């Protein structure tokens, strides 16, 4: 709470979790009177990784905060991703809405949300971005996969951002790619008045360093 107070009073621009329980920090951030989350803002998590076999940075959300995002929360997640991509110099981010298949089905309510989001994007709601889905991870990030499946998408296997349907898939992706693909990672909480670095206990020192660098890039 003392660190949150310092940020609120202008004494710091970035908040980083140390050796404390994550819940304690989140409670301080979410405090309605003395916290850091403005009224009406959504608290979520955005990560970015550099994978040796991918030709660009890859952002993704949410691997840490929202169990099952609502449509409005997904829209906010996309806006956070857009603003962060612009901080990294990506003027027209390609955002892929992730599912296990490219088919829309009422059995998977998030796929219905995706249809609404794509329609908003096509109407210009998000500005200069490319959004498509549902798509699976491989079709989102590998051009040949879409060609083999006969899937035509403006993402064209060159996604900058992956929006996952729930925290289980996002978190599994986060840990799998860092473990098996030797990816370098960084991540921040999105929504508070300042960047919040929330490292996992198993994150490497380099990952924490990259997260601090990401916070500096996105700092207002």
Regions found by a protein language model. Name each.
Residues 1-155, 160-220:
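Anion-binding alpha/beta catalytic cores of soluble intermediary-metabolism enzymes, centered on
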């Amino acid at each position: 709470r003392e660190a949150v107070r310092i940020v609120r009073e202008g004494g710091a621009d970035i908040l980083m979790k140390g050796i404390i329980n994550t819940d304690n920090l989140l409670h301080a951030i979410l405090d309605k009177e003395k916290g850091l989350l403005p009224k009406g803002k959504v608290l979520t998590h955005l990560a970015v990784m550099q994978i040796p076999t991918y030709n660009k940075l890859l952002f993704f959300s949410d691997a840490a905060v929202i169990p099952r995002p609502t449509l409005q929360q997904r829209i906010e997640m996309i806006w956070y991703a857009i603003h962060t991509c612009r901080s990294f110099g990506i003027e027209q981010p390609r955002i892929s809405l992730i599912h296990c298949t490219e088919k829309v089905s009422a059995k998977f309510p998030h796929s219905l949300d995706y249809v609404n989001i794509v329609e908003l994007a096509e109407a210009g709601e998000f500005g200069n971005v490319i959004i498509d889905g549902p798509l699976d991870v491989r079709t989102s990030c590998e051009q040949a996969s879409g060609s083999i499946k006969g899937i035509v998408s403006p993402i064209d296997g060159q996604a900058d951002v992956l929006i996952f349907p729930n925290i289980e898939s996002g978190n599994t992706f986060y840990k799998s790619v860092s473990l098996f693909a030797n990816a370098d990672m960084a991540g921040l909480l999105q929504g508070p008045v300042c960047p919040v670095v929330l490292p996992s206990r198993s994150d490497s020192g380099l990952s924490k360093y990259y997260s601090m660098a990401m916070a500096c890039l996105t700092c207002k």
